[in-house]
Each structure stands twice: as C-alpha cells, then as structure tokens.
C-alpha cells in the first residue's frame, strides 16, 4: 500500500504471516493427537524459563476432545497448551501416547484434572468398579457401610489385577492434585 502511495509516510506496517513457523517444528500430529514434542524448545520460543517444579499439567477430557495445558503455579505466566485432539475417546492407550509424546517422565509435573482422567492415568478400571476411590480401599458396593464406617484403609498399591487396577500407573499418586470441584478449561462448573 505504501508503494502505491495509499498511506501516509508515518504509517508502519507489520506482517505476522510467518510467526507460527517456529512453533510448527515443536508440535507434531500423530494418530489424531497434536502434541508438543519439545517442551524446552517451546518455552525457549516463548521466552519463558522452564523449571518443572513451577508448573502443573492440567488434562481435560470432555466428550469430544482431549486437552493438555501447562499452568504456572503462581499464575504469573500464561497457560501453555501442549496437546489437543478431537474425536478421540479417552482411554488408557491415548493417555499413554500423550504422556510419552510430551516426555512426562523427563519433567514429572504435578497433574490436575477431573477424576476420570486421573483414574485413567493411575490405571484404574473405568466402569462398574468396586474400588473406585483413588486414595482409600472403599468398597463402593457396600452401601450399608458408607454412612456408618468412618475409617477406610489407605490404598497400599496400584498393582494391575488388584482392586480394580487394570493397567500400570502412568504417574505416581504423589504427583496427583485432586480437584475440589469439577473443572473445565472454559468455565468452572458448580454442581
């Protein structure tokens, strides 16, 4: 526009057409999952100092999508999306692929999310479970004990085949931050 003298001389034009090119090499799409494969590279691109102890991984899995976002513990830095997929059913295999793609074993962030996602990460059976509690060995079918018994034994291990544990846990129980209310990336739902 300046070359045709359509703008005044003091007008500055900025072009943002290629700002995404640095990020394209950091993210990879595989089996319908878009995932950041180089978290350190992403942080360098965004000019953020990455200390894994200062971040927590939030995983949300509504009906039609799966999202993974890094939140800063002090909420002074922006949220950083590290994974997204559409039309993938949440399953142990999908979560395992996601955790391997973002190199969770390298960073070992604390994890927060809804109880269904946390149960998947811990390898628990998804439906019709007898021992559905993550922390205690509470029998969900013993309704007569729910209101009379106050002390339930702590869950000793997450061994596959014992007390509704189907798969090997992908994260340590100590890395889980339990939600106080159901969370959503968009809005917080209050029941």
Task: Mark where each language-model region is.
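Amphipathic alpha-helical interaction motifs in eukaryotic regulatory proteins
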Residues: 2, 96-100, 134
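Short, basic/hydrophobic alpha-helical segments
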Residues: 41-44, 93-107
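Short hydrophobic beta-strand that contains or immediately precedes a catalytic carboxylate
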Residues: 58-59
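Short coil/turn segments at secondary-structure boundaries
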Residues: 12-13, 69-73, 81-83, 136, ...
